[in-house]
């Protein structure tokens, strides 16, 4: 490519980022912010992909999708499924559960929405999670321990994920929960037809196999005090979760037999709810109301704006 100078002589135009003798690229970030025409030069800047930036769990979505697509090859002796599974579970120890119940904000942020349709990230996560369970893939234990003891209060997804990350670092973790089983809202809020209990149990057991201790049916303030916990542990993680429903701000919201969906689901999963009326009205049309409807086929749904 050539251009004309003021003297009318043609001189070659170059868009190279390197001068002769240079061995390192220059920093162009500031120029990109200062001048909108700088994008015409082939400059590459590392940034978080929109799918990954939309993931509350912080999964390396681009990483495990590259493995699934065959762009990044697994090491010798490792299947691509296991390699992708381990990349996925670096951040999230519940791929099989999340592949079933996550609302998938990553897919809303997917670049492919601008071309045709989103990449089925949630389905890939589901598949890799089930592969890990079917092939009994275990998490590697840390090579050394730190000698630090951490108490995790609450055995829901936050508490279990925290215990998982701490155990990988070599800390000694003990979980306290006032329920008979681990899982929190994954067990007592999400119905079994959405999260099969065998799947949930398998993913929880894989975390416990890292050497995590549990104290179930143990209520803080009744069975053990915070002073006792603080005296026995170097750190405490509070992961009680958001387990209370919010009633509608309308007259009659506190009338008899008017309950929040979370209260209904908890009572049903606890085994305390034996009978449901012949006609039930569910206000709302999202995932929680759908889970509630799944427990009874003779239900009238009223969806309010």
Q: Where in the sequence are the language-model features?
A:
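Ferredoxin-type iron-sulfur electron-transfer modules and their immediate structural context
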Residues: 1-149, 197, 236-254, 273
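N-terminal Rossmann-like dinucleotide/flavin-binding domain of flavoprotein oxidoreductases
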Residues: 82-92, 124, 186-234
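Glycine-rich FAD pyrophosphate-binding loop
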Residues: 171-187
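Redox-cofactor binding/interface segments in oxidoreductases and associated redox assembly factors
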Residues: 238-239, 260, 282
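A short, gly/pro- and small-residue-rich
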Residues: 249-266
């Amino acid at each position: 490519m050539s251009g004309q100078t003021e003297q009318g002589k043609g001189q070659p135009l170059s868009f190279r980022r390197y001068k002769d003798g240079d061995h390192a690229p220059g920093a162009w970030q500031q120029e990109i912010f200062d001048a909108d025409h700088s994008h015409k030069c082939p400059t590459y800047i590392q940034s978080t992909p929109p799918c990954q930036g939309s993931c509350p769990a912080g999964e390396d979505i681009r990483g495990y999708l590259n493995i699934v697509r065959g762009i990044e090859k697994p090491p010798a002796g490792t299947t691509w499924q296991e390699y992708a599974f381990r990349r996925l579970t670096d951040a999230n120890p519940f791929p099989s559960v999340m592949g079933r119940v996550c609302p998938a904000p990553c897919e809303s942020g997917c670049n492919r929405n601008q071309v045709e349709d989103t990449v089925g990230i949630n389905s890939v996560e589901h598949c890799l999670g089930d592969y890990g369970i079917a092939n009994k893939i275990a998490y590697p234990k840390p090579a050394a321990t730190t000698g630090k003891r951490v108490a995790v209060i609450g055995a829901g997804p936050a508490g279990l994920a925290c215990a998982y990350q701490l155990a990988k670092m070599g800390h000694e973790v003990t979980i306290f929960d006032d329920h008979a089983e681990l899982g929190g809202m994954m067990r007592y809020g999400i119905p079994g037809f959405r999260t099969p209990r065998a799947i949930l149990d398998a993913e929880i057991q894989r975390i416990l196999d890292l050497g995590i201790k549990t104290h179930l049916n143990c209520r803080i303030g009744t069975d053990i005090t915070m002073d006792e916990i603080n005296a026995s542990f170097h750190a405490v993680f509070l992961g009680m979760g958001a387990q209370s429903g919010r009633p509608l701000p309308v007259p009659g919201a506190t009338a008899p037999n008017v309950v929040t969906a979370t209260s209904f689901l908890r009572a049903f999963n606890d085994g305390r709810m034996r009978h449901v009326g012949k006609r039930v009205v569910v206000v709302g049309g999202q995932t929680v109301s759908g889970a509630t409807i799944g427990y009874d086929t003779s239900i009238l749904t009223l969806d309010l704006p």
